[in-house]
């Protein structure tokens, strides 16, 4: 068991993705192995993965290179063939690069990601039951110290206004790293309170899972 603390954490985004490399096969293994001709990756590269598997697609993963035409996806256990349909995981990979620091982060919070349930009550029973039907969408909200002259903040505003998708990276001081991918939204209107720094919220509405590495 280990504990992590927020002090020293860094936050980054990227809208820079290399050309897509076609994944012609994705194995039902732990970790899953991707067949991708002349991928050009090195171990530890961060990739945006698009796949027919719902729990894999639109997420950022790290790779371990096996050879010039294949790599494994760190942390992806696809051995459950009932959940990861054989042959359906094909798609593409794009290397993520050009990480940009998110400036003056004061707080971070997450929303959603919790299970959704539907309540069912058969007529022959007095006791209703909750049946799981999936998960609520996930999002992350950061509170930033407002500085309209900050170049990174201006870049974030541009991404927000054009409804562009970005990668998100949170690195803790102990080495753990979490990734996300989705739409970035940044406010231009600061909040003002006596005795406190002016702030603006920035949020990321994630399209896929948040993937974490120790």
Positions of PLM-derived features:
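Short beta-strand and beta-hairpin "edge-sheet" elements
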Residues: 169-214
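Short structured motifs
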Residues: 124-129, 187-188
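Short coil-to-beta transition motif at edge beta-strands of beta-rich domains
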Residues: 37-53, 160-167
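Acidic, glycine-rich flexible loop segments
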Residues: 144-175, 185-187
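Small/polar beta-strand repeat architecture
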Residues: 2-7, 15-30, 36-39, 53-126
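Oligomerization/assembly interface segments of phage tail-like spikes and tubes
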Residues: 129-148, 196-211
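Well-ordered beta-strand positions in beta-sheet-rich domains
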Residues: 46, 58-62, 70, 177-183, ...
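Intrinsic-disorder/low-complexity, polar/charged segments enriched in Ser/Thr/Lys/Arg/Asp/Glu/Gln
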Residues: 31, 139-141, 165, 179, ...
């Amino acid at each position: 068991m280990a504990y992590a603390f927020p002090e020293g954490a860094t936050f980054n985004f990227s809208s820079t993705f290399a050309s897509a490399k076609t994944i012609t096969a994705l194995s039902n293994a732990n970790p899953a192995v991707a067949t991708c001709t002349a991928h050009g990756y090195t171990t530890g590269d961060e990739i945006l993965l698009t796949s027919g598997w719902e729990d894999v697609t639109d997420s950022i993963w790290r790779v371990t290179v096996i050879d010039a035409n294949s790599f494994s996806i760190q942390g992806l256990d696809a051995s459950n063939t009932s959940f990861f349909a054989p042959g359906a995981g094909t798609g593409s990979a794009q290397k993520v690069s050009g990480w940009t620091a998110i400036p003056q982060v004061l707080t971070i919070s997450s929303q959603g990601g919790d299970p959704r349930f539907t309540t069912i009550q058969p007529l022959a029973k007095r006791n209703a039951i909750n049946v799981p039907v999936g998960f609520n969408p996930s999002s992350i909200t950061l509170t930033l110290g407002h500085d309209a002259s900050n170049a990174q903040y201006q870049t974030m505003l541009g991404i927000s206004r054009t409804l562009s998708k970005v990668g998100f990276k949170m690195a803790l001081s102990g080495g753990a790293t979490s990734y996300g991918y989705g739409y970035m939204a940044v406010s231009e209107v600061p909040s003002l309170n006596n005795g406190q720094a002016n702030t603006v919220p920035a949020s990321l509405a994630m399209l896929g899972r948040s993937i974490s590495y120790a």
